[in-house]
């Protein structure tokens, strides 16, 4: 439904529609949280090692969705939202080692109730600023009382070092209103390389112990 309404009753109806749609994405996150908890416990039971340190999840705010639709030149409707925004539901998985990241992905590929739509591997091919992470766009069913809805979600999987770097970079850009001097961007990129070296070093030590 379109947001261009003139009467208060119409506006209330529109907002209810949006609230209901976003609730479906919240249910998707609930299901994913359960899925990752099962993966952690079963993997630990079989391999004696938990590949997931912790997870964070969020549903994009209404304001963020509207802003993103406007940037894309889309109408502000729930239909456009579903078609053009695939990270409304987002999960971030933090792993100890780089190998854990790919192990988690391989487990997800075996789940019949989840379809991997797109993979962006910024570990093998980092962004120009040094950012590393593995991004998945997945599609999954959400079983409601009277229907099944298929929704997309974004899963970001990264190591503790990658997450620390990304969090710091985000804070710096936010504090400086995206106007970051070249000296700082160069230092951030250097820090990203150091973080990656640490990841590789710790993975090497793990392999020696194993």
Swiss-Prot record:
Homotetramer. Changing residue 176 to F: No longer inhibits growth when overexpressed in relA mutants. The keyword Protease does not apply. The keyword Nucleotide-binding applies. Induction: Weakly expressed during exponential growth with a marked and transient increase at the onset of the stationary phase. Protein expression is very low during the first 3.5 hours after inoculation (at protein level). Induced by alkaline shock. Disruption phenotype: No visible phenotype, double yjbM-ywaC and triple relA-yjbM-ywaC mutants are also viable. Disulfide bonds: none annotated. This is GTP pyrophosphokinase YwaC. Belongs to the RelA/SpoT family. Pathway: Purine metabolism; ppGpp biosynthesis; ppGpp from GTP: step 1/2. Pfam families: RelA_SpoT (PF04607). One of its GO terms (biological process) is guanosine tetraphosphate biosynthetic process. It comes from the Bacteria. Changing residue 87 to G: No longer inhibits growth when overexpressed in relA mutants, probably does not synthesisize (p)ppGpp. 70S ribosomes no longer dimerize to form 100S ribosomes. Its EC number is 2.7.6.5. Keywords: ATP-binding, GTP-binding, Kinase, Nucleotide-binding, Transferase. It catalyses: GTP + ATP = guanosine 3'-diphosphate 5'-triphosphate + AMP. Functions as a (p)ppGpp synthase; GDP can be used instead of GTP, resulting in an increase of (p)ppGpp synthesis. Overexpression in relA mutants (triple relA-yjbM-ywaC deletions and single relA deletions) leads to growth arrest; GTP levels fall drastically, various guanine-related nucleotides are synthesized (ppGp or pGpp), the cellular transcriptional profile changes dramatically and 70S ribosome dimerization occurs. Overexpression in the presence of a wild-type relA gene does not have these effects. SUPFAM superfamilies: Nucleotidyltransferase. It comes from Bacillus subtilis (strain 168). InterPro entries: GTP_Pyrophosphokinase, NT_sf, RelA_SpoT.
């Amino acid at each position: 439904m379109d947001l261009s309404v003139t009467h208060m009753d119409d506006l209330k109806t529109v907002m209810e529609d949006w609230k209901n749609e976003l609730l479906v994405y919240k249910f998707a996150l609930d299901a994913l949280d359960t899925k990752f908890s099962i993966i952690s416990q079963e993997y630990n039971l079989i391999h004696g090692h938990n590949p997931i340190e912790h997870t964070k999840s969020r549903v994009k705010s209404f304001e963020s969705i509207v802003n993103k639709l406007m940037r894309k030149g889309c109408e502000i409707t729930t239909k456009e939202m579903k078609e053009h925004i695939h990270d409304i539901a987002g999960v971030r998985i933090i792993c100890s080692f780089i190998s854990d990241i790919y192990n988690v992905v391989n487990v997800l590929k075996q789940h019949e109730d989840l379809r991997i739509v797109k993979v962006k591997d910024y570990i093998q091919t980092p962004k120009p600023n040094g950012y590393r992470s593995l991004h998945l766009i997945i599609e999954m069913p959400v079983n409601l009382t009277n229907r099944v809805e298929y929704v997309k979600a974004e899963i970001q999987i990264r190591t503790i070092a990658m997450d620390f770097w990304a969090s710091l970079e985000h804070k710096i850009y936010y504090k400086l209103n995206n106007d970051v001097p070249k000296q700082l961007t160069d230092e951030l990129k250097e820090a990203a390389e150091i973080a990656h070296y640490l990841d590789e070093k710790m993975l090497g030590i793990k392999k020696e112990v194993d």
